[in-house]
Swiss-Prot record:
Protein name stated in the entry: NADH-quinone oxidoreductase subunit D 2
Originating species: Rhizobium etli (strain CIAT 652)
Membrane topology of the entry: Peripheral membrane protein
Keywords: Cell inner membrane, Cell membrane, Membrane, NAD, Quinone, Translocase, Transport, Ubiquinone
Catalytic reaction list: a quinone + NADH + 5 H(+)(in) = a quinol + NAD(+) + 4 H(+)(out)
Lineage: Bacteria, Pseudomonadati, Pseudomonadota, Alphaproteobacteria, Hyphomicrobiales
Length: 404
């Protein structure tokens, strides 16, 4: 393993510096979106960082109050737009909890399989983007090759590459298409070797290791105090994963490991995501092998569209059902609920208040990127300006999810 050189701040009067303010972003290729950081610098050392957010605010939570529950799914696509199936799933589970229903088992397997594909897709991007931010572009070209395969699979299932809107309350929009299983098995067979390619590119790269190891360290205590979740939490040694500790859907039927590391630095956060992709492949394989027969949508005319779409053209009852759900939606009992999943970025939760109408009275999104961004306050003190790029990239925020 290549030796990592530790950088330290010069002491005494070796350098004559003065404090300056520097704007990093909102238009900067390494801020991962429209994030503006106002940095207080003493020479090259960051004394303070002040994030300015809101450049991508679209009012998702307020818009939801004017939409029926089914119409909200496209809004959730645009939170973490790298992983729409996870956003769809989190929202669907919250509404189903209010209704007191569960999706059919086949639909749950399909949902989990798509959520893990989304996890791999999201982790792939930061696996290549973090090295690219630090000057090693080759890794990004490698990961985009495999990410294109995932986009093809999502397009095969949903008809869309990014904004899938595939989940529905009580199931999924439609069943898996013919020819899907051979395609996803092929991907599962190829992908583990491709992960090893990424590791060979970067594990002995002296520049990458110097720029990530020992940089941006977050202790386990600080990670918990800041409310971090997902790989950013587990990279600090906190063994917590909602899929295992508060299982939803069929995760309690699946065998997988929760990846943790103790270092809490930029490299540990990058490494956690790489190793999690292997676990996701194992989960997808189990979903394929265990996939049961049965309906992909709950059979409740007051909530779900007709399972047989052809009936809409020849049955007055089915036509009325389809029209009512499309035009007016379905009513949800009065109450409030919070439901969370383990999204690629961390704990993604939806808090919904229902007043008994077909539209939520209030919806609050617990976006993991928003919470994880707080870590910038605690990890950049007296570090080089160049380290800011590594720290921000390793936290892997998506600004659409931060600003909502």
């Amino acid at each position: 393993m290549t030796e990592v050189t530790e950088l330290s701040r010069p002491e005494g009067e070796a350098l004559n510096t003065r404090e300056v303010l520097l704007n990093l972003g909102p238009q900067h290729p390494s801020t991962h979106g429209v994030l503006r950081l106002v940095l207080e610098l003493d020479g090259e050392f960051v004394e303070r960082v002040d994030p300015h957010i809101g450049y991508l605010h679209r009012g998702t939570e307020k818009l939801a109050e004017s939409f029926t529950y089914t119409q909200i799914f496209p809004l959730t696509d645009r939170l973490d737009y790298l992983c729409p199936p996870s956003n769809n799933l989190a929202f669907a589970l919250a509404v189903e909890k209010l209704l007191g229903i569960e999706a059919p088992i086949r639909a749950q397997y399909i949902r989990v399989m798509m959520a893990e594909l989304a996890r791999i897709s999201g982790h792939l991007l930061i696996t290549g983007a973090l090295p690219m931010d630090l000057g090693a572009m080759t890794a990004l070209l490698y990961v985009m090759r495999e990410r294109e395969m995932i986009m093809d699979l999502l397009e095969m299932i949903t008809g869309a590459r990014m904004h899938t809107s595939f989940c529905r309350v009580g199931g999924v929009r439609e069943d898996l298409p013919d020819g899907f299983f051979p395609k996803i098995r092929e991907f599962c067979d190829i992908f583990p070797n491709r992960i090893r390619d990424y590791e060979r590119l970067l594990e002995d790269n002296r520049v990458f290791l110097n720029r990530t190891k020992g940089i941006g360290v977050i202790s386990a205590e600080d990670a918990v105090d800041l409310g971090l979740s997902g790989p950013n939490l587990r990279a600090s040694g906190v063994d917590w994963d909602i899929r295992r500790d508060e299982p939803y859907e069929i995760y309690d039927r699946l065998d997988f490991n929760v990846i943790t590391r103790d270092e809490g630095d930029c490299y540990a956060r990058w490494r956690c995501r790489v190793d999690e992709m292997r676990e996701s492949i194992g989960i997808i394989k189990q979903c394929i092998d265990q996939m049961p027969e049965g309906p992909f949508q709950i059979d409740m005319p007051t909530i779900a569209f007709p399972l047989d779409k052809d009936r809409v053209h020849c049955s007055m009852e089915a036509l009325i059902q389809h029209f009512d759900l499309s035009a007016y939606g379905f009513k949800v009992p009065k109450g409030e609920v919070y439901s969370a999943i383990e999204a690629p970025k961390g704990e993604l939760g939806f808090y919904i208040i229902s007043d008994g109408s077909p539209k939520p009275f209030r919806m609050k999104v617990r976006a993991p990127s928003f919470v994880n961004l707080q870590a910038l306050f605690g990890v950049t003190n007296a570090r080089y300006l160049a380290d800011m790029i590594a720290v921000l990239g390793s936290l892997d925020p998506v600004m659409a999810e931060v600003d909502k």
